[in-house]
Structures are given as structure tokens and as C-alpha cells.
């Protein structure tokens, strides 16, 4: 890996923090042991790959020194002190003024309960009252961007590519509004939606709800990309995997299904509860999933191999919402209670979440923090990006809880910038549109896209098999040469266009399918006109003036 300088190879410096950047499969035996390889050219190539790998690991470890910010957690002064007993009032009095001011507490008792959703960069907050109150605001500056009183039931809302547009799931249809609250679109295809989400790299608005259908809508072109029937009744919970954009749906029979817009059937189905699934959360890396059900259970899954890490049975009350922060903190709401755990996503048995101090056992993962909304009920919760805050929407308003260590201390401003200007936001929108991924690229393993199919060599026919296939076809043609071809006078209805539309991909709506449907309608109109001419209803030179005027827009 090193460069030759003055006849010597430059040594690669090993870093103290290099271990956390090395692959787990890169063992000591694989580092330098290439003596068993007899091919000199292959051995030299393997050594070169090893040197490049060492250089990459050393460079990654060196850049870690340039990230001085670190996560700060609550630390007890002695073994008898428990962090979950610390109240929010004590934390506010101890932190700096700017952090204390971010502990938002809005009292909105008239239109609750409230559903909250933060923008991807954490700058804006979108609140949705069940009784029709919708508002978008810059919560850090205290500026209200848009406020709507829709006078009908609203269930959920989400921002689209940025805070300039947001979608609201209302009583029957889903609507899209701009940053001033002006209605832009009414999506008639999305009926009785209860859950909304947006895939930023594919520009897809995803909805699910009472109808049992999962629908993908491309907001850049306005086309309905796909509509999938879940066959599991109303959707109880929905979450997206940020790593591969696969949607996770929770159903009333206790199953969690994973969906891609290009597949009519779920990619994976797993049983997560003995009752309805109330909430689903997936961590930022896309490795772990947390679910909670009406059977008073909470389970944590490793979705790389779909194995269960931890299972907490017999919660005091059924969990209603679950969320995972960028740093791996797990938050659970049950009634008026909100409980958080640290290190709950680790594999060790000591990481299993539990309640209380468990008799002072130091090898138990007791709650990291807890909060009680007395006489209230939590509607939903979500961590604020890049902030040590947990947003909670409840029956009487919105509250931000200060949770030390919840936010990512070092962020990539080229990806998500919480301090972006108007010009940067516009450039970012253009950049994401140019780099928009097709809906067909959503799969369980995104690394498989562009790779070589190793099975193709075994599936491909060799020269001998091709010759035999050609010979069999010629012999069959000679044998049936005396059979005349039957050509009926009436054209059958089983045309190529109809057979294309009858394929199993009825749920996929693309440009080709729209062109085929348009061609079928055109042929149908021609046959209808010829029939009317034959019956003497119209003349051959008859022209429909209105139809010709509107045909230019077809």
C-alpha cells in the first residue's frame, strides 16, 4: 500500500482506535499469510489488496481524531444513584440556556391528541391534531410557517423532500400542502390512509391504512408507482428502513411484513407478537428493529439474519410507541409513561431492557431515563435529529424532553445540514432530484445491485446444447409441415397488448403500461366508429369537433 520513496516502502502508521474500523472477518491469519499461494502474480495481487485495506483503515481511524465532539450521557456519582430518577426540572437547571430553551412545551388542549414529525435535518416540526389542526413551524426560532384548521379528522403527516412541502392523511383522502399552507394536490388514490412516510432518495410518498393497501406515489412525476395489497387487514404500524428503503408494516395478527414496490408479495414475514403490532422502530444503520404489541411485549430483532435479540414480556401496560435515536437509545411509551434504555441493541444478555433497579443487580440494563405525563396519554414520539431531545406528542400538546446523549454529535453537512441556508436547500433539492433512484432498486440487499450474477455461467447453455435445441426445432417443423395453418377470419381478443396487461405485475404502474392502455383505448374507439359507420349511424367523413380539440392533450 505504501509508496516507494528513495527505494524504501513507506510504513503505514497503526492507530490506537484502529480496531473499531477493521472488518470482523479480517483475521490475523488473513493479514499476511499468503505463502500458501503458489501463483506469484496472484500472491502479489493479494498483498497489494492487503496494503490498500490497511491504508484505508488507518485513514479512517485518523479522521476520527478530527471529530472532537462526543456524546455526553447522564452518569451517576455512585452505585446507589439511578439516572432514571433524575427529573426534567433538574436537567433544565443544570444545562446551558440554549439547550434549556429547546425543551419545547406547547399546551394545545382543544384539538388533541397530537402527532409530531420532525424534518430530516431537525429544523422544522410538523404537528397534526386529531381534530384537524395542522401546523408547520421552525421550532428553534419559534416561527410559525403554516397553520391549518381543516375541520375533519387528521391521522398523520410528514414532510416531503424538505420542509417546503408536507402531506397530511385526512379523513378520506391524502392532501399535499406547501410551506404556506396552500393545498397543492388531492391524492384520490390514497384513501383512508393512517400512516405516511417519505423515501428521500427515491422521492416516493408511502401510505398505508384502513384499506389494507400499501401505495407508493412518486412526488417528482406525480405517478402512482405501485399499489400492493397486504391481505392482512388494516395496517397498524409502519416504518421505513433507512438503509435499504424497505417498508416494515405491522398487522393486527401480530406479524411484521417487509415490502418493496417491485414485488407483489412481502419480502419477509415474521411473527412479532401474539396480538396487534402497535409500533415499529428501526435504527439508523438498518440493522436492528424494535416492535411493541398489544400483548404487553417488546421485542428487539437483528434484521440482518431475522433473529430475536431480546424479548421483554409482560410489560406493566401495553406499549403504544417505540423509537430509536441515532446513538442507539431506545424509547418506549405506554400510557402516560415514557421510558428510555441505553445499550439495548447490543447482543449480550446484560443488555436486555428491564424495569426498576432489579434489586441493585449491576448486570441488568435498567432504564436510562423515564418521564411521567400525569393524567395524560402519549400519542407518538420521535427523537429530534442532531439534538439531545425526544419529541413527544400527547393529548394536551407537544413536549420536548431533554435526553443527554440522544443526538449525533458529528453530522455530515453534505448529507443533512441543520444550518443550511435557502440557497443550499435549493441546491440540495436539485442534487437529490438528479440522483434520484428508481423504485426498482429497493431491495433487501442494496449492495447486490450492479453485481455479477455468478449463477449465469451454470444457467447458460453451451454450444452442444444450443445445437441440439436448434436441431429439435427443425425436426419438429419438418414433421408438422403437412398441417395447414388455421387463420380465423375473426381476430381473437387475446392480443399481445391484453396479454401484457394480464401479467402478474398488475400492481406496478409504469410509463409502458400507460402507453399500452392508451393504445387499447384507441383501438376500441376505432372499432366502435367502424361499427357505427357499418350500421349507418354516422358517415365516413364524420368528425367529432370536441374530441379533435381535446385530443391534443391526450
From Swiss-Prot:
Which InterPro entries does the record associate with it? BING4_C_dom (IPR012952), WD40/YVTN_repeat-like_dom_sf (IPR015943), WD40_repeat_CS (IPR019775), WD40_repeat_dom_sf (IPR036322), WD40_rpt (IPR001680), WDR46/Utp7 (IPR040315)
Q: Which GO terms describe its cellular component?
A: 90S preribosome; nucleolus; nucleoplasm; preribosome, small subunit precursor; small-subunit processome
Coiled-coil features, chain-numbered ranges: none
Question: Which Pfam families does the entry mention?
Answer: BING4CT, WD40
Polar residues bias (residue ranges): 24-35
The highest taxon in the source lineage is Eukaryota
Q: Where is the composition biased (Basic and acidic residues)?
A: 13-23
Q: Quick one: where's region Disordered? A: 1-39, 475-496
* Sorted UniProt keywords: Nucleus, Repeat, Ribonucleoprotein, Ribosome biogenesis, rRNA processing, WD repeat
- Segments of skewed composition (Basic residues): 1-12
Query: What are the ranges of the WD repeats?
Result: 108-149, 230-269, 272-311, 314-351
What the entry lists under SMART domains is as follows: BING4CT (SM01033), WD40 (SM00320)
Q: Name where it's found.
A: Nucleus, Nucleolus
Q: Which GO terms describe its biological process?
A: endonucleolytic cleavage in 5'-ETS of tricistronic rRNA transcript (SSU-rRNA, 5.8S rRNA, LSU-rRNA); endonucleolytic cleavage in ITS1 to separate SSU-rRNA from 5.8S rRNA and LSU-rRNA from tricistronic rRNA transcript (SSU-rRNA, 5.8S rRNA, LSU-rRNA); endonucleolytic cleavage to generate mature 5'-end of SSU-rRNA from (SSU-rRNA, 5.8S rRNA, LSU-rRNA); maturation of SSU-rRNA; maturation of SSU-rRNA from tricistronic rRNA transcript (SSU-rRNA, 5.8S rRNA, LSU-rRNA)
* Keyword Iron (UniProt): no
Q: What pairs make up the disulfide bonds?
A: none
What does the annotation say about its assembly with partners?
Answer: Interacts with snoRNA U3. Interacts with MPP10. Component of the ribosomal small subunit (SSU) processome composed of at least 40 protein subunits and snoRNA U3.
Q: What else is known?
A: Present with 5800 molecules/cell in log phase SD medium.
Function, in words: Involved in nucleolar processing of pre-18S ribosomal RNA.
Protein name as annotated: U3 small nucleolar RNA-associated protein 7
Organism equals Saccharomyces cerevisiae (strain ATCC 204508 / S288c)
What gene is it encoded by?
UTP7
Amino acid at each position: 500500500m505504501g509508496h516507494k520513496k528513495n527505494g524504501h516502502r513507506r510504513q503505514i502508521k497503526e492507530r490506537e482506535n484502529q480496531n473499531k474500523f477493521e472488518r470482523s472477518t479480517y483475521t490475523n491469519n488473513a493479514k499476511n499469510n499468503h505463502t500458501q499461494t503458489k501463483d506469484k502474480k496472484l500472491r502479489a495481487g493479494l498483498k497489494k489488496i492487503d496494503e490498500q485495506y490497511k491504508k484505508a483503515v488507518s485513514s479512517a481511524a485518523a479522521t476520527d481524531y478530527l471529530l472532537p465532539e462526543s456524546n455526553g450521557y447522564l452518569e451517576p456519582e455512585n452505585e446507589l444513584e439511578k439516572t432514571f430518577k433524575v427529573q426534567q426540572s433538574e436537567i433544565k437547571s443544570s444545562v446551558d440556556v440554549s439547550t434549556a430553551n429547546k425543551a419545547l412545551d406547547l399546551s394545545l388542549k382543544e384539538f388533541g391528541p397530537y402527532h409530531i414529525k420532525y424534518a430530516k435535518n431537525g429544523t422544522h416540526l410538523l404537528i397534526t391534531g386529531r381534530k384537524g389542526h395542522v401546523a408547520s413551524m421552525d421550532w428553534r426560532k419559534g416561527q410559525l410557517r403554516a397553520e391549518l384548521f381543516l375541520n375533519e379528522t387528521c391521522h398523520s403527516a410528514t414532510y416531503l423532500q424538505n420542509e417546503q412541502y408536507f402531506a397530511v392523511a385526512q379523513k378520506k383522502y391524502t392532501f399535499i400542502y406547501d410551506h404556506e399552507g396552500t393545498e397543492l394536490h388531492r391524492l384520490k388514490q390514497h384513501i383512508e390512509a393512517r400512516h405516511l412516510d417519505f423515501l428521500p432518495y427515491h422521492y416516493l410518498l408511502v401510505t398505508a391504512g384502513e384499506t389494507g393497501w400499501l401505495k407508493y406515489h412518486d412526488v417528482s412525476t406525480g405517478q402512482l408507482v405501485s399499489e400492493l395489497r397486504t391481505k392482512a387487514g388494516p395496517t397498524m404500524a409502519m416504518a421505513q428502513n433507512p438503509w435499504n428503503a424497505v417498508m416494515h408494516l405491522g398487522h393486527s395478527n401480530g406479524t411484521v411484513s417487509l415490502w418493496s414496490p417491485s414485488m407483489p408479495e412481502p419480502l419477509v414475514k415474521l411473527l412479532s407478537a401474539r396480538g396487534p403490532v402497535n409500533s415499529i422502530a428501526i435504527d439508523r444503520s438498518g440493522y436492528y428493529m424494535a416492535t411493541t404489541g398489544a400483548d404487553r411485549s417488546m421485542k428487539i430483532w437483528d434484521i440482518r439474519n431475522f433473529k430475536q435479540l431480546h424479548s421483554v414480556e409482560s410489560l406493566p401496560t401495553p406499549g403504544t410507541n417505540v423509537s430509536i435515536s441515532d446513538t442507539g437509545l431506545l424509547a418506549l411509551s405506554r400510557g402516560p409513561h415514557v421510558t428510555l434504555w441505553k445499550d439495548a441493541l447490543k447482543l449480550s444478555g446484560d443488555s436486555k431492557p428491564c424495569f426498576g433497579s432489579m434489586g441493585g443487580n449491576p448486570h441488568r440494563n435498567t432504564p436510562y431515563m423515564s418521564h411521567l405525563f400525569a393524567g395524560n396519554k402519549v400519542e407518538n414520539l420521535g427523537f429530534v435529529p442532531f439534538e439531545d431531545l425526544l419529541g413527544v406528542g400527547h393529548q394536551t400538546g407537544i413536549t420536548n424532553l431533554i435526553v443527554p446523549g440522544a443526538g449525533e454529535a458529528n453530522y455530515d453537512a453534505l448529507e443533512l445540514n441543520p444550518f443550511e441556508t435557502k440557497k443550499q436547500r435549493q441546491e440540495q433539492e436539485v442534487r437529490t432530484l438528479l440522483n434520484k433512484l428508481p423504485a426498482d432498486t429497493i431491495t433487501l440487499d442494496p449492495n447486490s445491485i450492479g453485481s455479477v450474477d455468478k449463477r449465469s455461467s451454470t444457467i447458460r447453455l453451451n454450444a452442444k446444447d444450443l445445437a441440439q435445441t436448434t436441431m429439435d426445432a427443425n425436426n419438429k417443423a419438418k414433421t408438422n409441415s403437412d398441417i395447414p395453418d388455421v387463420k380465423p377470419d375473426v381476430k381473437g381478443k387475446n392480443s399481445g397488448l391484453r396479454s401484457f396487461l394480464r401479467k402478474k405485475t398488475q400492481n406496478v404502474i409504469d410509463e409502458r403500461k400507460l402507453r399500452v392502455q392508451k393504445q387499447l383505448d384507441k383501438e376500441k374507439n376505432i372499432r366502435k366508429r367502424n361499427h357505427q359507420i357499418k350500421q349507418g349511424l354516422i358517415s365516413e367523413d364524420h368528425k367529432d369537433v370536441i374530441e379533435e380539440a381535446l385530443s391534443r392533450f391526450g
